């Protein structure tokens, strides 16, 4: 009986800490993904991708070549890698 009580005393604090340990590893979307698409300035017409936080997906827009913000990716893969949560 004494052995069981000892095991319970050791296991209980570990179980109480586990939820906090998991919560601290929550994934949060980078703030750049919340920026609006900005065409920038210039004369080019480049197809780029931005993360649309309302639709929760990467969408295309036309980038003019200069300026804008960092929610601007050359490939849809780059946008998804940065802004879409992938468990595992």
UniProtKB/Swiss-Prot annotation:
Modifications after synthesis and translation: Contains 2 disulfide bonds instead of 3, as for all Kunitz domain proteins.
Tissue: Expressed by the venom duct.
Record-listed Proline amide modification sites: 87
Domain of life according to the entry: Eukaryota
First and last residue of the signal peptide: 1-23
Keyword list, A-Z: Amidation, Disulfide bond, Ion channel impairing toxin, Neurotoxin, Potassium channel impairing toxin, Protease inhibitor, Secreted, Serine protease inhibitor, Signal, Toxin, Voltage-gated potassium channel impairing toxin
UniProt keyword Protease present: no
Residues in BPTI/Kunitz inhibitor domain copies: 33-83
Subcellular location(s) of the protein: Secreted
Family annotation (InterPro entries): Kunitz_BPTI (IPR002223), Kunitz_BPTI_sf (IPR036880), TFPI/VKTCI-like (IPR050098)
Cystines in this chain: 33-83, 58-79
Presence of the UniProt keyword Secreted in the record: yes
Gene Ontology CC annotation, any one: extracellular space
Pfam families documented for this protein: Kunitz_BPTI
Coiled coil: none
One GO MF term attached to the UniProt entry: potassium channel regulator activity
Family affiliation: Belongs to the venom Kunitz-type family.
Stated role: Blocks specifically voltage-activated potassium channels (Kv) of the Shaker family.
PANTHER family: BPTI_KUNITZ INHIBITOR DOMAIN-CONTAINING PROTEIN, KUNITZ-TYPE PROTEASE INHIBITOR-RELATED
Protein name per its UniProtKB record: Kunitz-type conkunitzin-B1
Biological source species: Conus bullatus
